[in-house]
Amino acid sequence: MKFIVKPHPEIFVKSESVRKRFTKILECNIRNIVKSRTESVAVFNRRDHIEVTSESDEFHAEVLEILTHTPGIRHVLEVKQTEFKDLHDIYEQVLELSGSLIEGKTFAVRAKRRGKHDFTSIELERYVGGGLNQAVESARVKLSKPDVTINVEVTNDRLNQVLASHKGLGGFPLGTQEDVLSLISGGFDSGVSSYLHIKRGSKVHYCFFNLGGPAHEIGVKQVSHYLWNKYGSSAKVRFISVDFEPVVAEILEKVDDGQMGVILKRMFMRAAGMIAQKMKIEALVTGEALGQVSSQTLTNLRHIDNVTDTLILRPLINWDKEDIVNLAREIGTEDFAKTMPEYCGVISKKPTVKAVKGKLEAEEQKFDFSILEQVVQDARMTDIRDIAKESKQAAPEVEQVQAVEEHAIVLDIRSPEEEDDNSLEIDGVEVKHIPFYKLGTQFGDLDQAKTYLLYCDRGVMSRLQALYLQEQGFNNVKVYRP
């Protein structure tokens, strides 16, 4: 197994020292993730590309998944590497591997060369292409928009034939930019805005203002853990949970109805700014888009920004909702967001779309700011890697079993894609497939006289979902870990 990783082109327009630093960070990021999930896979930095190799194909799918979801990579090439003697030997090897692919089709050969050879890249393309054209009678050379492009790379005495090319995330390697604190609610917008900053190279820490109790927090932790695990697991990041119910209660009791929405957002920014200052983070990230809701007009956003000196980044400010949802679907957060409750919208019945500074300040004079200071002081900070462990500690009553008891039903809560790749079948046991993101709405329709064992590959999502269901009053759930 061998992959050639091509860094994002923006890295190579940097100065020599910056380019070296960025590619070194990318190399370390890849190595850290690969080491944590596989065995006997080596990572090498080759100046303008990174090689990931192994003597076996055991972890092929896992490594490809890692590389195509790691920021800073333009594309990933799967290659077959062999030694060669001369130009004709290269042609024969290419014919053996690719001859059948060009039958009845147009083709072109694209070659790259590094090292000292007695032929140029153009001569290599002409020799191999001409040979293939003669050897495969039904094939025809076409240099512009061919049906098949055969990519060949020669490095010193090694021939790399490209078997497949996979698109990477692009962006910058994680850790090349400064850390940010994302205000995450679990909805479409905050998940996408967090992803965009991960992709751009920032370590994204997550700040959650809890308005909906334990069930809401569990859902947001799932989204945050998913984003970190899928796109940023080379970084150590924090999840901060702030119990904002006392602040909401104070607003509901003392603040004029029309000003509630903007003042709540101002309280969010004040609290997040305090937390960012403690963590020595220079910027906050939100999923706000211009005009999407009443608090997101230009006037209101300006009033919201003015309560903190911390920079507020809004990567989605000019995005349409449809585009946000489409990207959420692409990155895998849509299903979380669809089942996530929305609490902020119920705060104000007649929200102002053009707040006045004097009115806001007058209403905030009624507010007891010691409550805000206290909830920030009581904020819980968790290493995001410990979310799985925390779910065990938070719900010790969630029983974990290795064998299926009589009459119990196993619920496979993996995504449809995971279930299709490796379906769960147990002799003599009924197995139902309900994706985790539909469990909250469909579990109540099941026969509650039965016991249900939740199953996922690693046991993390099953524990979190079991905790969620128990918070909803269902006590007939356990975690299945065969």
Swiss-Prot record:
Chain ranges of the Rhodanese domain: 404-482
Domain THUMP as annotated: residue spans: 61-165
Record's GO cellular component terms: cytosol
Cystine pairings recorded for this chain: 344-456
Catalytic activity: [ThiI sulfur-carrier protein]-S-sulfanyl-L-cysteine + a uridine in tRNA + 2 reduced [2Fe-2S]-[ferredoxin] + ATP + H(+) = [ThiI sulfur-carrier protein]-L-cysteine + a 4-thiouridine in tRNA + 2 oxidized [2Fe-2S]-[ferredoxin] + AMP + diphosphate; [ThiS sulfur-carrier protein]-C-terminal Gly-Gly-AMP + S-sulfanyl-L-cysteinyl-[cysteine desulfurase] + AH2 = [ThiS sulfur-carrier protein]-C-terminal-Gly-aminoethanethioate + L-cysteinyl-[cysteine desulfurase] + A + AMP + 2 H(+)
Biochemical pathway: Cofactor biosynthesis; thiamine diphosphate biosynthesis
Cellular location(s): Cytoplasm
Protein name, UniProt field: tRNA sulfurtransferase
Lineage of the organism: Bacteria, Pseudomonadati, Pseudomonadota, Gammaproteobacteria, Vibrionales
